[in-house]
Amino acid sequence: MAEFKRYLELDISQQHDFIYPLLFQEYIYALAHDHGLNRSIFLENAGYDNKSSLLIGKRLITHLITQMDQQKKFLVPDSDSNQKKNLGYNTNLYSQMIFEGFAVVMEIPFYLRLLSFLEGKERVKSHNXXXXXXXXXXXXXXXXXXXXXXDIQIPHPIHLEILVQTLRYWVKDASSLHLLRFFLHEYPIWNSLITQKKSIFSFSKKNQRFFLFLYNFHVCEYESIFVFLRQPTSHLRSISSETFLERISFYRKIELEVFTKDFKSILWLFKEPFLHYVRYRGKAILASKGTSLLMNKWKYYLLNFWQSYFYMWSQPRRIHINQLSNHFLDFLGYLSSVRLKPLMLRSQMIENSFLIENASKKFDTLMPITPMILSLYKAKFCNVLGHPMSKPAWSGLSDSDIIERFGRIYRNLSHYYSGSLKKMSLYRIKYILRLSCARTLARKRKSTVRAFLKRLGVGLLAEFFTEEEQVFYLTFQKVSFTSGELYRRRIWYLDIICINDLANYE
């Protein structure tokens, strides 16, 4: 670890040249082991200790480089178990170690840039970025003023080679990139490690950290187009995406105003009325005050950018342009829309009175009940119509564990959907979980639900299904809320982004 810290203290001009030798250092794989691999599954053979196993992983890289013609002897498919035994180690396990080591090494240049940024050595590229925890609150405050929104499914690269080519603009060590390219191409099942699942990548549990690093870097590069949003009023656009300059000098040319001085014939300034960009996983929202014509221009601008810069074919149907007043927006597990709230005002001037109609925009967020019932149906809490069922798999647990599990599920859902404007859908989920819990307890005692509740009382389940709105009301007792106001009150909790599974029903 001390050697790793000494490396980080090197001058930035030297660090790119020393990434490749780090792949042969044992402490790199120790870091990868501590961060990514599970200690309980690390050793398949009791005769190996951690140090010798890490050394074998390091030797595997050396053999793969010096004997590339014989790489099949070291990377054996899963079906050939006899040859695995002859080699004396689990090939898939050590290939996982190598990819985890790659992830540690490739993250070093970006970590150093982060340190430089924190020390004030680098200028911020974008001043309008917000934290992920503020995404929900920003959508509620900013989207209410928007008129149209583009629902974007972020495209994925056709080939992992595209990710390596993009990565070379940031990692200047050619040897490391060549070795990375070799592993991606020569690894027997590399193309099965990453699979397409709708709009996002679905990673296998093996090598998850490494491929998440590549994918996050890909998304970061995709979002580089929004460097134009640094200036809130005027931005640059091009007639053809072929005029995009190389990424390596992209920011420098913008800062030197080369666009406005040397490319007046193909680039011009245009007024951008209002733009908000929010991304979560494989989806993004681009909202604007502008007209549908402006949003369509942005749509085809993005499509051309993806195809020419990332060499990806992205179908136009991956970007849906909707009017927020007429369509619901599916994002972060919420159904959101902007509706007009009519308001009638009476104004009187001396003898005459006037009725003035006014309408204000209101941002609505609703809990999607159909996907929620489908999720509960898949988890065997109810049938496809939403009728509660018992959970036989939990019948062997104690009563307190059963009630705690059901209560924890509901509290998580209540916590996540506390930003919903109407709670009727949440109350229906509460009914399903409470009755499913009661039926599970009754099944355990081989009794009916009515007899069980009559004997123990309904209050047995009440404390485990306490809603967070009630806790909020008890905490701030000096603030008076009626039951109707509490029902319509929207509370955003900043940690809901951590509950990933609740926001991805796809």
Swiss-Prot record:
It is found in: Plastid, Chloroplast. Keywords: Chloroplast, mRNA processing, Plastid, RNA-binding, tRNA processing. GO terms for cellular component: chloroplast. Disulfide bonds: none annotated. It comes from the Eukaryota. GO terms for biological process: mRNA processing; RNA splicing; tRNA processing. Transmembrane segments: none annotated. Its main location: plastid. InterPro entries: Domain_X (IPR024937), Maturase_MatK (IPR002866), Maturase_MatK_N (IPR024942). GO terms for molecular function: RNA binding. Pfam families: Intron_maturas2 (PF01348), MatK_N (PF01824). Usually encoded in the trnK tRNA gene intron. Probably assists in splicing its own and other chloroplast group II introns. HAMAP family: MatK (MF_01390). Belongs to the intron maturase 2 family. MatK subfamily. This is Maturase K. It comes from Phyllodoce caerulea (Blue mountain heath). The gene is matK.
